Curated annotation (Swiss-Prot):
Source organism of this protein record: Escherichia coli (strain K12)
Name of the protein in its database record: Bicyclomycin resistance protein
Residue intervals annotated with topology Periplasmic: 27-48, 99-105, 160-165, 240-250, 303-308, 367-372
A GO molecular-function annotation: xenobiotic transmembrane transporter activity
Lineage, highest ranks first: Bacteria, Pseudomonadati, Pseudomonadota, Gammaproteobacteria, Enterobacterales
SUPFAM superfamilies recorded: MFS general substrate transporter
C-alpha cells in the first residue's frame, strides 16, 4: 500500500469517526423519547421537539461554520465546534425540565454542524468530484457503525441507568474526537486560498448559490430526501414502541435493518459512481425512495402489516447516504472555490427542511402510522419534483 493510500485511509477513518457524533446524538437518543415523555409528564409532540430543535440548530450552524471554514481554515472551526458539542451534551444531561432540554438540544445541534461542514469541505480540498463521492461513501460507511449500534446501546442504557447517561456518553465521545482532531488532522486550506471573512462577501457567495437554479434544486431535492428519513427518526420510536409494542431495548434491532440497507447502498454507490457518475447515482437514489414511499402507502392501505412498513422504511433510509454524498459531489463541483459556503448552504437546506417537517409532524396525533407515512410520501414526491425540474434541458 502506498503512502497516499495510507494517508487516504487514515483521513477517511478519522473523518468517519468524527462524523459519528451527529448520528450518535440522534440515534442513541431515539429509544428514550417515550421514556422522557413519561418522566416529564408531557405529550409525545413536546419530546419530538427536542429532535426538531437539534436539527434546526444543526441547520443554522451550517450557515455560520461554512464561511468561517473558508476564511479561517478547516481545523480550528471543527475543533471549536466539537468542544462546544461536548459542553452542550453535559448541559442536556443536567436538564431538569423538557423546556431546558429543548433549548439545550438546539445548542447541541448548533455545535454539531461544525463537523458536517468541515468534513465535506476538507474532503473537497483533497479529492476531485467522482473521487470525492467515492471517498465520502467510505466516510459514511464508517459512520454507519454509529447508527447501527446507537439505538441498541441507548436502549440498554435506559434499562440499566437512565436517559441522562446517553448525553454523558456523547460528551465523552466529543472530548475524544477533539483530541483526534488536535493531534491527527492537518489543515487542508492554505492561507493563500482563504477568503476574507466579510459579511458582504459571505452574502454575495450565498446569493451566487441561490441564483444557480439547478444547484438550488439539487439542494432542495437532497433536503426533502433527508426530511423523509427524519420523519421516521422523529415519529418512528412512537410508531414502533407505543403503537406496535416493540420494547425500548429491542427498538435498536429493528433500527439496525435500516443500517443494513444503508450499508448495502453505500457499497453499491462506491462501486458504481465512477462508472455512471455522481449525478445519475443521485437521481437513482431519489427514485428508489419514491418507490419505497409509494410501497408504504399501498401496504398500509391494504393492511399488509407491521413488517411491510419496517422493510419500506429500511429501504428508504438506505438510500439517504447515496443521495446525500452524490448531491454534495455535484454541488461542490460547481463551486470548488467556496466549498465551505456551498456545503453549509446545502446542509442548511437538508437539515432545515428536516427540522420543519419534524416540527409539523410533532403536531400529529399518533394513533396509527399514517402521519409518518404521509410525511415520508410527501418528502419523496417533493424530492422527485425538484430533481425533474433541475433535469430540464437548458434554454438556449
Amino acid at each position: 500500500m502506498t503512502t497516499r493510500q495510507h494517508s487516504s485511509f487514515a483521513i477517511v477513518f478519522i473523518l468517519g469517526l468524527l462524523a459519528m457524533l451527529m448520528p450518535l446524538s440522534i440515534d442513541m437518543y431515539l429509544p428514550a423519547l417515550p421514556v422522557i415523555s413519561a418522566q416529564f409528564g408531557v405529550p409525545a409532540g413536546s419530546t419530538q421537539m427536542t429532535l426538531s430543535t437539534y436539527i434546526l440548530g444543526f441547520a443554522l450552524g451550517q450557515l455560520i461554520y461554512g464561511p468561517m471554514a473558508d476564511s479561517f481554515g478547516r481545523k480550528p472551526v471543527v475543533l471549536g465546534g466539537t468542544l462546544v458539542f461536548a459542553a452542550a451534551a453535559v448541559a442536556c444531561a443536567l436538564a431538569n425540565t423538557i423546556d431546558q432540554l429543548i433549548v439545550m438540544r438546539f445548542f447541541h445541534g448548533l455545535a454539531a454542524a461544525a463537523a458536517s461542514v468541515v468534513i465535506n469541505a476538507l474532503m473537497r480540498d483533497i479529492y476531485p468530484k467522482e473521487e470525492f463521492s467515492r471517498m465520502m461513501s467510505f466516510v459514511m460507511l464508517v459512520t454507519t457503525i454509529a447508527p447501527l449500534m446507537a439505538p441498541i446501546v441507548g436502549g440498554w442504557v435506559l434499562v440499566w441507568l437512565s436517559w441522562h447517561y446517553i448525553f454523558w456518553i456523547l460528551a465523552l465521545a466529543a472530548i475524544l474526537a477533539s483530541a483526534m482532531i488536535f493531534f491527527l488532522i492537518k489543515e487542508t486550506l492554505p492561507p493563500e486560498r482563504r477568503q476574507p471573512f466579510h459579511i458582504r462577501t459571505t452574502i454575495g457567495n450565498f446569493a451566487a448559490l441561490f441564483r444557480h437554479k439547478r444547484v438550488l434544486s439539487y439542494m432542495l431535492a437532497s433536503g426533502f430526501s433527508f426530511a423523509g428519513m427524519f420523519s421516521f427518526l422523529s415519529a418512528g420510536p412512537f410508531v414502533y414502541i407505543e403503537i406496535n409494542h416493540v420494547a425500548p431495548e429491542n427498538f435498536g434491532y429493528y433500527f439496525a435493518l435500516n443500517i443494513v440497507f444503508l450499508f448495502v447502498m453505500t457499497i453499491f454507490n462506491s462501486r458504481f459512481v465512477r462508472r455512471i457518475g455522481a449525478l445519475n447515482m443521485f437521481r437513482s437514489g431519489l427514485w428508489i425512495q419514491f418507490i419505497m414511499a409509494a410501497w408504504m402507502v399501498i401496504s398500509a392501505l391494504l393492511g399488509l402489516g407491521f413488517w411491510s412498513l419496517v422493510v419500506g422504511v429500511a429501504a428508504f433510509v438506505g438510500c439517504v447516504s447515496m443521495v446525500s454524498s452524490n448531491a454534495m459531489a455535484v454541488i461542490l463541483d460547481e463551486f470548488p472555490h467556496m466549498a465551505g459556503t456551498a456545503s453549509s448552504l446545502a446542509g442548511t437546506f437538508r437539515f432545515g427542511i428536516g427540522a420543519i417537517v419534524g416540527a409539523l409532524l410533532s403536531l400529529a396525533t399518533f394513533n396509527s402510522a399514517w402521519p409518518m407515512i404521509w410525511s415520508i410520501a410527501f418528502c419523496a414526491t417533493s424530492s422527485i419534483l425538484f430533481c425533474l425540474y433541475a433535469s430540464r434541458p437548458k434554454k438556449r
